[in-house]
Every structure is written in structure tokens, then in C-alpha cells.
From Swiss-Prot:
The chain crosses the membrane at residues 13-33, 72-92. Its EC number is 1.9.3.-. It is an enzyme of class 1 (oxidoreductase). This is Heme-copper oxidase subunit 2. The keyword Metal-binding applies. Belongs to the cytochrome c oxidase subunit 2 family.
Length: 234
């Protein structure tokens, strides 16, 4: 099953809202420019309340539901409803668990002032601090909590973040890039104390086959592998 990366979903929404905004702004601007020429002064005296201001007043106040007004209200309603439906649809997609069963599950525990990452390997837990090694071209499900105060875990490039709350397990997912070698920063997005600005983790993307060779070899081999990878970036 093809999975849309989280960042692509947010960019798609951003471009949709931008396109609608540009279209609306262009339409309004064109109307104003048209009005400047259409209703410019002709040099002839007009009767009381017979000018453009009077016509606009009658359209907007005395006859707010004229034919044109109804049409504009209808079109505006369709556009707004379309944006609402698109936003809800994309947000619900992001909030679901990864749509495939073979996602790599990583436990993320926030603390003042760092991140603890846990892999389940062969029934045992392999732990790293502030450095996370993940395979390329893979869905990663983060199960996020905190052991002290409120935090929020997020990786800017993937346009996704989730609250880390003591006693509550939240989840979010990302799809790593196809090519290994990328390194991303993971930040805390919740003011959590004096060391908040220093609470930055590293997410290192490695070759998928190499990662799973170590992962499937047991906790000892995998722990040595991730520590060797991490040592290159410290």
C-alpha cells in the first residue's frame, strides 16, 4: 500500500489554502480595479444618494439577499466547506496509526531535558539517549510519553508533532526518506523548564537493509550497531 508522507500531506493542504487565498485576493483586487474605472467621476452632478456609495448601500443593506448576493454566498459556502472537509480528511489520516503492519515502533520518553528512545528487539529493550537511528524508506510509529513534565515531540522536516504527557501514551508516525544519510533534529515544542532550548535530539537515517540485518540479529548485535552509528555523529 502506498503511503503519503506526513510532510507531503501538510504541503498539499498549504498549497490548497494558498491557491484559494490567491484566487480570492485576485478576484477582489480585480473587482476594485474594475470599480475604479466603472464608477469614476463623470463630472456631472448627481441627485442625493444617487452615486456609487448609494448603490452600494442599497445592495449591501437594503437588499442583502439579491440574486447576486445569494450566488456569492453560495459560492463562498461551497469553498469554505471544501476547505473544512479537506482539512478534516487529511488530519484524520495523520491521526491514525501507520496504515501498514510492518512499521517500526519506537518508544519516545521525554524528560528534563532530553529524549529517551526505546526499541523492542527480540523481546528485550534497546535504549538510546538523544540519538535515534532509523532505517530509510520505512514507516516509523512513535509512541510518546513523558516521565516528568509536559513535553511535545516533533521533527520539523516531517511536519508532525505530538504531546508527551506523563501517564498518557500518544502516537504519531512518519515515513523516512528513500535515501540514507539524512540527519534531522527532534525538538521539544512545549516550554518545559530552564533547559528547554537544549532539548534537541538527532534522528539518523541509515540503510534499510543494514539496519534490519542488525535488528534481526538480536539485542546485543543491534545495540552495538546503533551505538557505532551514533558515535559517528557525536
Amino acid at each position: 500500500m502506498d503511503v503519503i508522507p506526513t510532510e507531503a500531506i501538510w504541503w498539499r493542504l498549504f498549497l490548497l489554502f494558498t491557491a484559494v487565498g490567491v484566487l480570492a485576493a485576485g478576484t477582489v483586487t480585480a473587482f476594485f480595479i474594475y470599480s475604479l474605472f466603472k464608477y469614476r467621476s463623470s463630472g456631472q452632478a448627481l441627485g442625493e444618494d444617487q452615486g456609487t456609495a448609494g448603490r452600494i448601500y442599497r445592495i449591501m443593506v437594503e437588499s442583502p439577499v439579491s440574486g447576486k448576493s445569494k450566488y456569492l454566498l453560495f459560492v463562498t459556502g461551497i469553498i469554505v466547506m471544501g476547505l473544512i472537509v479537506a482539512t478534516i480528511d487529511e488530519t484524520l489520516y495523520l491521526e491514525k496509526s501507520p496504515p501498514v503492519e510492518d512499521a517500526l515502533v519506537v518508544m519516545v520518553i521525554g524528560f528534563q531535558f532530553g529524549w529517551q528512545f526505546e526499541y523492542s528487539v527480540g523481546g528485550e529493550t534497546v535504549t538510546t539517549l538523544n540519538y535515534l537511528v532509523v532505517p530509510s524508506d520505512t514507516l516509523i510509529e512513535f509512541r510518546v510519553t513523558s516521565r516528568d513534565v509536559f513535553h511535545a515531540f516533533g521533527i520539523p522536516e516531517f511536519k508532525n508533532k505530538i504531546d508527551a504527557i506523563p501517564g498518557i501514551l500518544n502516537s504519531m508516525w512518519i515515513k523516512t526518506p528513500d535515501e540514507p544519510g539524512k540527519v534531522y533534529n527532534a525538538y521539544c515544542y512545549e516550554l518545559c523548564g530552564i533547559g528547554h532550548s537544549l532539548m534537541v535530539g538527532k534522528v539518523i537515517v541509515v540503510d534499510k537493509e543494514e539496519f534490519y540485518n542488525a535488528y534481526n540479529s538480536g539485542p546485543d548485535v543491534f545495540s552495538e550497531y546503533v551505538n557505532n552509528v551514533i558515535s559517528k555523529y557525536k
